[in-house]
Amino acid sequence: YISKGAKVTYVEKHYGEGEGTGDRILNPTTIVHMEEGSYCEMEMTQIEGVTSTVRETEANLGKDAKLVVTEKLMTHDKQHATSNITANLNGKNSILQIVSRSVAKNDSTQSFHPIAVGNEKCRAHIQCDSIIMDNAKVASIPEIQANHTDAAIIHEAAIGRINNEQLLKLETFGLDEEQAEAVIVEAFLS
């Protein structure tokens, strides 16, 4: 619960490593209730090493509340990651911004499903950008719902591979293809 006028920064970072042979499973659930005029910034990062994850995030925004969510995700090998975010903009003049950036490599799979529900005069923007490599699979399913005539909700989604021109430019500086890809991925997720 975030009280009236309060400001909260929530940071969650995950990286799995080790010599063990078992699966590394991570299924976090975050629920936030935001009172009038409150502000919350969530930064959720998962960079490799987690075999399977299902992230559930729910937010309920009151009057003049603002929520900013930044999600960064990288999967590789046969890893699977699902992220479900539901934000209910219940208060007048509430604001939501979700930015998701992800990279899927090898045979990994990703699914991102953000939902913005405008129940009052509000503004929301969802942006999902993914880089897909090798044999990976990525699904981006932004969902918007307006239950009020003054709800202004926008979503954008883009999935694509690394541009060959970017690789070539970095290779002219002496990087090999693998190093060039690493530079592009790091910059994309930063």
Please give the residue ranges for each predicted region:
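Conserved beta-strand/loop scaffold segments within soluble protein domains that form the structured core
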Residues: 1-175, 186-190
